[in-house]
C-alpha cells in the first residue's frame, strides 16, 4: 500500500489567511486623524469669518444708528414746529412742547454731525476724531442726548395725555406723533450708546 508523504498533505491544505496591510492612507483616503484635523480647521475658519462679520457690523452700526436718530429727530422737530392751529392749539403756549422742540433740534444737529463724521471715516478710512477720544465721545454724548430726549418725552407725554382725554383733534394727534418720533430717536441713540460702550470696553491702550 502506497504511503502519501506528509509534505504532500501539507501542500494540499489551503494556506492560512494573511492579514493584508491597510494602504488606504497611501491611496488618498483620509484617516481619522486627518479628518479630525480637517474638521478643526473648518471650525477655526468659521469662527474667524463670524468675528469679521461682527466687527464689520459694529463698525457700520454707528453710522446707521446716528442717521436714524437724525431722521426721527428731524421729523419730531418739524411736527412740533408746525403744530399751530390757533387759540389754545399753539405749541408755543406750552413750555413742555417748547422744551421738546429744543431737545429735538439738539438731537437732530448732534446726530447729523455724528452721522457725517462716521460716513467720512468709512469713506476715507480716517476718523476726524482720534480713535480713543472718539469712542469716549460717542459713549458719553450719546448718553447725554438720549437722557435729554427722555426728559423731554417725560415732560410732554402727561400734558398730551390730559389733552387727548378731553379732545382728540389735529393738534393732539400731531403732538402724539412728534412724541413717538422723539422716542424712536431716543431708542436709536440708546442703542448707539450701547455699541459705543462695548467698543470702549474692548479698547486696548497698549
UniProtKB/Swiss-Prot annotation:
UniProt cross-references to InterPro entries, sorted A to Z: CASP_dom
Alphabetical keyword list: Cell membrane, Membrane, Transmembrane, Transmembrane helix
Give the UniProt entry's GO cellular component terms.
plasma membrane
Where do the segments described as Disordered lie? 1-42
User: Which ranges does the record list as Cytoplasmic topological domains?
Assistant: 1-60, 121-138, 196-206
Signal peptide (from-to): none
Q: Which residues lie on this side of the membrane: Extracellular?
A: 82-99, 160-174
Spell out the disulfide connections. Answer: none
Residues spanning the membrane = 61-81, 100-120, 139-159, 175-195
Per UniProt, the ranges with Low complexity bias are 1-12, 24-36
On assembly, the entry states: Homodimer and heterodimers.
Entry's family note: Belongs to the Casparian strip membrane proteins (CASP) family.
Protein name as it appears in the record: CASP-like protein 4B2
Which organism is the protein's source?
A: Oryza sativa subsp. japonica
Lineage runs: Eukaryota, Viridiplantae, Streptophyta, Embryophyta, Tracheophyta
Amino acid at each position: 500500500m502506497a504511503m502519501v508523504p506528509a509534505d504532500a498533505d501539507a501542500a494540499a491544505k489551503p494556506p492560512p489567511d494573511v492579514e493584508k496591510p491597510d494602504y488606504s492612507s497611501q491611496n488618498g483616503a483620509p484617516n481619522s486623524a486627518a479628518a479630525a484635523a480637517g474638521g478643526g480647521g473648518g471650525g477655526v475658519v468659521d469662527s474667524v469669518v463670524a468675528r469679521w462679520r461682527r466687527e464689520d457690523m459694529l463698525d457700520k452700526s454707528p453710522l446707521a444708528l446716528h442717521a436714524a436718530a437724525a431722521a426721527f429727530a428731524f421729523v419730531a422737530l418739524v411736527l412740533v414746529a408746525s403744530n399751530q392751529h390757533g387759540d389754545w392749539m399753539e405749541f408755543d403756549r406750552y413750555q413742555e412742547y417748547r422744551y421738546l422742540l429744543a431737545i429735538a433740534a439738539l438731537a437732530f444737529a448732534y446726530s447729523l454731525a455724528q452721522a457725517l463724521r462716521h460716513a467720512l471715516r468709512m469713506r476715507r478710512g480716517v476718523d476726524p476724531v482720534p480713535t480713543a477720544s472718539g469712542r469716549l465721545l460717542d459713549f458719553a454724548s450719546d448718553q447725554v442726548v438720549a437722557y435729554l430726549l427722555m426728559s423731554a418725552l417725560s415732560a410732554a407725554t402727561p400734558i398730551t395725555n390730559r389733552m387727548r382725554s378731553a379732545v382728540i383733534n389735529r393738534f393732539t394727534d400731531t403732538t402724539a406723533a412728534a412724541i413717538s418720533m422723539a422716542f424712536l430717536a431716543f431708542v436709536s441713540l440708546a442703542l448707539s450708546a450701547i455699541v459705543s460702550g462695548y467698543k470702549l470696553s474692548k479698547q486696548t491702550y497698549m
